[in-house]
């Protein structure tokens, strides 16, 4: 029933690898070291084990009353196995992603049924998602730099607003209101805009104020996309070069770079969602920065169900390349800036281990996610600083509805942000 529903496909766009059947059950066969542990996997696993369970992103050092708040928006991910079911339930209840009959009853049923399999995936990557930890580290670095770059709008404070796990977007807004901020910046952590990611988070902000029946006490604006920011591009390029150097020197020029982004149902694309073009823009700028040293392709991961999605799919592309003798592959998560289930499980385990063995690949590695790279924190600070200096409420793109938009809330959200007074 679930896989046949076209409406469910929109929800699966956000859920991605979380809602897929694992390719393996239990322990997999031992893999060659280069397959099991890329630099990305080692760094992510080590950092998570030491820090993920102790980090409290909203707790920041005592300081002067904040003047400017930066709300870092993302889907989020369960930190523990016990949080998986609530995460899935909130996801299936999100009407920006899907509308179903008796949704309030069906969502808990679906979540409960999927929980054991998804918990197993999280168990395989250490017991939970590290995305909250990484967002906290990035936020700390960002506001420290912002206080130096923009003393007129300091002190700056970051807030984390997740859609499906705590701290929820609504909880973050309440904290921001209590803090008495003068200005609030909704800052999506997805470089490329999609209605199902950034759009859903911005809708949550509009809904919060609409439901409480009060106007904001702070002035809102938003950084709603940043696919070609120079420092973002530099970070990706640096991580690609670093990982390319781990391939045997005699094979290095043969490596195919596969930029992998979360796929999207074609029904969403055909409504005019700008996501595919913006991901392509990021890829183009990264390869331009690198000087086109290797062949490359943009591929799409996490397709679920029988309805058409953006392709080619990452796993099918890997199979096809190996069949054609291109067995040295570098995976680059181009739409994700922090490690989570789709990098640590789908790319590192499903593709780099299990699929690599099936295909007889020689070397499959993954470029490390941006995570704790100081240059990435500098990129975030520069984005916010430039946004403040521009005195703009949002990008010009945000004011344009998808030509075939079917969600009336999107129009109200756009009106909410474009009507703010700075």
From Swiss-Prot:
Its EC number is 4.98.1.1. [2Fe-2S] cluster binds at residues 195, 402, 405, 410. It is found in: Mitochondrion inner membrane. GO terms for cellular component: mitochondrial inner membrane; mitochondrial matrix; mitochondrion. Induction: During erythroid differentiation. Protoporphyrin IX binds at residues 114, 122, 129. The active site is at residues 229, 382. The modification N6-acetyllysine is found at residues 56, 289, 414. The modification N6-succinyllysine is found at residues 137, 289, 414. Keywords: 2Fe-2S, Acetylation, Disease variant, Heme biosynthesis, Iron, Iron-sulfur, Lyase, Membrane, Metal-binding, Mitochondrion, Mitochondrion inner membrane, Porphyrin biosynthesis, Transit peptide. Residues 1-53 form a transit peptide. It is a peripheral membrane protein. Belongs to the ferrochelatase family. Catalyzes the ferrous insertion into protoporphyrin IX. This is Ferrochelatase, mitochondrial. It comes from Mus musculus.
